[in-house]
Amino acid sequence: MDAKLYLNKAIMQLSRGLEEGGVQGLKAAVEGEGDEVSKTQARVILGEYYVMKGDFAQAREYLGPVAQDAERLRDQYDDLLDDEICKADMLLDMIERFGFLAE
């Protein structure tokens, strides 16, 4: 399966409350073959998931590459990934501000 299929399957599983399968599907989307857009979307969803779980180190692992590549992603994909880039930046900012709560 390619990244887009893993992403769609994971979103469906998460919407049905199948958390473990959804997370594994998102990880497969990030690690597998496929388009960069789907991989970026999966990274942001995983990052948000780990922020909500209070696992900020794991969240940074997925959100960091999106924030670091933001300029290139914007140049290459115009505004297609703007929402994901903004969300990654916002979540990383939250981690910086409130990370002490998880310690």
What are these regions (language model features)?
Residues G54-D75:
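TPR/TPR-like (Sel1-like) alpha-helical repeat modules
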Residues M1, V37-K39, D83-I85:
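Residue signature of alpha-solenoid helical repeat architecture, marking inter-repeat boundaries
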